[in-house]
A protein has these predicted regions:
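C-terminal segment of classical bacterial N-terminal signal peptides
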Residues: 21-30
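Helix-centric, low-specificity signal for extended rod-like, repetitive segments
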Residues: 3-5, 21, 41
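Generic start-of-chain signal for non-secretory N-termini
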Residues: 2-4, 29-32
């Protein structure tokens, strides 16, 4: 065979193989840049410390000195936030408002995990009794390090993860999310999560299903067993694999008219235990759960699910419609891992059952919120969530609503944003804590 014929033969062979591969691997979800696995290398890295004829050198580093790992940002979180931070309200992939809004203005992203900008929002107030109190930004969630976006952990409440040993100084986006995601769901029942085997063909966050030949990535690229960032030295590898959950494709949105339902399936609290191991309490035992609410697969809603479904707001437990009852302010885990079932559940508003369970994200947001400990609402003892039908705020027309213990240094608009845009009419005129969604009794109201 002459060289020209050989070249033609090789080209034809490559085209045939390419067509076969395309026919084997299903089309990827168009809105999923990471596609469940590793994205395009040059989105995060630069080969020669430059891009578009501009150097990547930042933050007064000597010209020619590159960022670690040839990243486009000064560090791991900065590189993530290059794409995931922005000022456009409810921009689908944004999880941090940037620039951070000034005092009196609110972060604009409304993803289920919350807006990291709250880590830079400090609230101060004086109570009706004259006591000065505050809620510093560092208390509002997971304190990531990002030099380019001014997120630092030196003011964090904890030097290590509460209930664990993970060092706060090493906290970044990739502490939880594997940027080169190796973790893949191998079957439609999500019974097997592996790091090798079938190639990842799409995201595992939106309901794509594995096939006989391909897998899908883990939920939100979360790391699994033995995962830790390459930059972290020490014995900090994860024990548990990623949770199984499915999000709707439209999730960064106001919930003023309807809830955004992430169908949490299985393993969320057990995964959180990778860093917060001693906080794990998955059985209801007063001697071991004092100060820590039970959560995890065994913390079933058996005794409270009827209250959850009947509850509309404080004092109103009249819902009897079995297709209603769900609230994304108090989500639950379903205790299942079937991907198709979970995908269908993202469109439902039905409430809980006896086999569902409490999880960490029932009360907390994964990233950050307007409240201490990244809770979904103001959980301070004795705090009303509405006063005389209005949200509390420093600008409230109601004197009690102005009081610091209720307003917590926020305007009424800021407060409403922290409730994901819900109008106060969704709640009772004097709304107690949303602990009542499960525990509608005086003992648990405050």
């Amino acid at each position: 065979m002459n060289p020209k014929s050989m070249k033609y033969f090789r080209l034809k062979s490559c085209l045939i193989v390419s067509v076969l591969l395309i026919s084997i691997i299903p089309a990827r979800t168009s809105y999923s840049f990471h596609d469940g696995g590793v994205a395009a290398c040059d989105a995060c890295h630069t080969m020669h410390n430059s891009s578009g004829n501009f150097p990547m050198t930042k933050n007064a580093m000597p010209l020619g000195q590159g960022n670690i790992f040839l990243l486009r940002g000064s560090d791991q979180s900065s590189t993530c936030l290059n794409c995931h931070a922005g000022s456009t309200p409810q921009d689908r992939i944004k999880i941090a408002t940037n620039p951070v809004p000034v005092q009196g203005s609110y972060p604009v992203q409304l993803t289920p995990g919350g807006d990291f900008a709250y880590l830079q929002k400090n609230y101060n107030w004086v109570t009706s009794l004259g006591t000065a109190q505050s809620s510093p930004g560092a208390n509002h969630g997971h304190n990531i390090n990002s030099l380019d976006y001014l997120y630092f952990t030196n003011s964090a409440r904890w030097s290590i993860a509460p209930g664990g040993v993970y060092p706060t100084a090493a906290m970044s986006c990739i502490s939880c999310h594997d940027p080169h995601n190796r973790f893949r769901i191998m079957d439609a029942g999500a019974t097997t999560i592996a790091t090798t085997g079938k190639p990842i063909s799409g995201s595992g966050s939106y309901g794509d299903l594995p096939t006989a030949l391909t897998a899908v990535g883990s939920y939100r690229l979360l790391g699994g067993q033995f995962y830790k960032p390459a930059s972290l030295q020490g014995n900090y590898g994860f024990v548990a694999n990623p949770p199984v959950a499915i999000a709707p494709s439209s999730y960064n949105r106001s919930e003023s008219l309807s809830d955004t339902r992430v169908a949490y399936g299985l393993g969320m609290s057990e995964w959180c235990e990778n860093c917060h191991s001693t906080l794990q309490h998955n059985t209801v035992n007063p001697s071991t759960t004092l100060g820590n609410h039970p959560f995890g697969y065994s913390a079933k809603l058996t005794n409270v699910y009827t209250t959850y479904n009947a509850y509309i707001y404080t004092g109103n437990l009249t819902n009897t419609d079995l297709t209603q009852g769900y609230s994304s302010l108090v989500p639950f885990e379903e205790g299942i891992s079937d991907l198709a079932t979970l995908a269908a559940d993202t469109a439902k508003t039905s409430g809980a059952s006896a086999t569902d369970n409490v999880m960490c994200l029932t009360c907390h947001r994964a990233h950050a919120s307007a409240w201490d400990s990244a809770t979904r609402w103001n959980t301070a003892k004795g705090a009303y969530l509405t006063v005389s039908g209005f949200y509390p705020g420093v600008d409230s027309p109601i004197l009690q609503g102005e009081q610091g213990e209720y307003a917590t240094g926020k305007t009424m608009a800021e407060y409403q944003q922290s409730m994901y845009g819900r109008p106060p009419s969704k709640f009772a005129p004097l709304q107690w804590s949303l602990c009542n969604k499960c525990h509608e009794s005086d003992q648990y109201k405050q």
